[in-house]
Amino acid sequence: TGFDPFLIYPEYLLLLLNELNSSGAEAISINEQRIISTSEIRLAGNHIVINGEKFSRPFVFKVIGDGQTLQSAIQLRGGIVDLLNSNYIQVTIKKEEEITIAKYSGLVDFDYILSNEEQEQ
């Protein structure tokens, strides 16, 4: 299959997510899905799956952190915002005084990590 200019590929979301994380984001959600270390972001047909839920445009990132630092990081010349814009993806940045990001509501299942209670048994 060829490149679809109207489809947002998960790689774009992951690049933005990584830039925000490396710039000090303390909490991030995409379309109200809290992002944690085990969150999946993948393509499924014409949708992006985030934490098991299907989404399509628009994608709204909510980010808690130092607004100036985060904005500067993603707006570097030749950075992620330039990449998105060059791929026909419009980016709008809006600073808010107060942002609420819900806690992760899914299950976190680990195979190799034990809780303190499990270790004591």
Task: Please provide the spans of the model-predicted regions.
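Extracytoplasmic/luminal low-complexity segments enriched in Pro/Gly and acidic/polar residues
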Residues: I64-Q121
